[in-house]
């Protein structure tokens, strides 16, 4: 998927909003929604997607996976987690809340649709400990170009924070 100006503004706005919150508001943990969809809302040709497929959060925030379409779930990639983080696997067709306290980058996928490239990335706090390593993890089938695109947008997002 090509990154549009609208995508850049969305990423920038989400990042700015999370950093401008008073520390007390962040301490309670914000909720970030990720929809599990059969079709990308802006490109119906793009099938089996998490939307958004990259999320920037603070430690203690919750990522809420919404089963907007049936037959999807969220599962951690064990080889794409920060040290000390716990893996997860949600039930297919169910909403799922994931609260993240360990800083770093988290790769995940939809169990039935991994081969379709239904993958995503969560960036929690300081990701310098494992972000670059995650880029080198071997990807297969349609997951490879999707993760390449996600990491390109992640690079842009992180560069904007520097």
Predicted regions located by residue number:
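Beta-strand cores of secreted/periplasmic/IMS beta-sandwich domains, seen most often
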Residues: 51-74, 95-102, 106-109
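Histidine- and aromatic-enriched segments that form or immediately flank copper-ligand environments
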Residues: 66-91, 120
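C-terminal segment of N-terminal export signals and the immediately downstream linker at the start
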Residues: 22-40, 84-86, 92
